[in-house]
Each structure stands twice: as C-alpha cells, then as structure tokens.
C-alpha cells in the first residue's frame, strides 16, 4: 500500500518531534533518532510510543 507523501511531510515522531521515514516493506513509519518503528494499521499511522517497536 502506498503512503501519502504529503502526510509524511507533516507527521513527526511523538517522542522527539523529528522526521519519520516510511518503510514500505514493513508498513511502518520509522524514527532513526529514537530507533522506533510506528505501525500503520489499515492505512492509519499509529503514532503512540507504547505501540512502537524498536528498530534493529
């Protein structure tokens, strides 16, 4: 599923307020600074720290 690039320009990491990157294969929004992956569920980003997974 494609992710809206315009939305990607305005969303931010809820932890550090930094830029997020879309991982098409994993269907996540990733914060490289905090090393967290936020899931995208049914096309909706879930930007909750307690739902994020650590990036390896």
UniProtKB/Swiss-Prot annotation:
InterPro entries: Trm112-like. It comes from the Bacteria. One of its GO terms (cellular component) is cytosol. Transmembrane segments: none annotated. Belongs to the UPF0434 family. This is UPF0434 protein Sden_2197. It comes from Shewanella denitrificans (strain OS217 / ATCC BAA-1090 / DSM 15013). The lineage of its organism: Bacteria, Pseudomonadati, Pseudomonadota, Gammaproteobacteria, Alteromonadales.
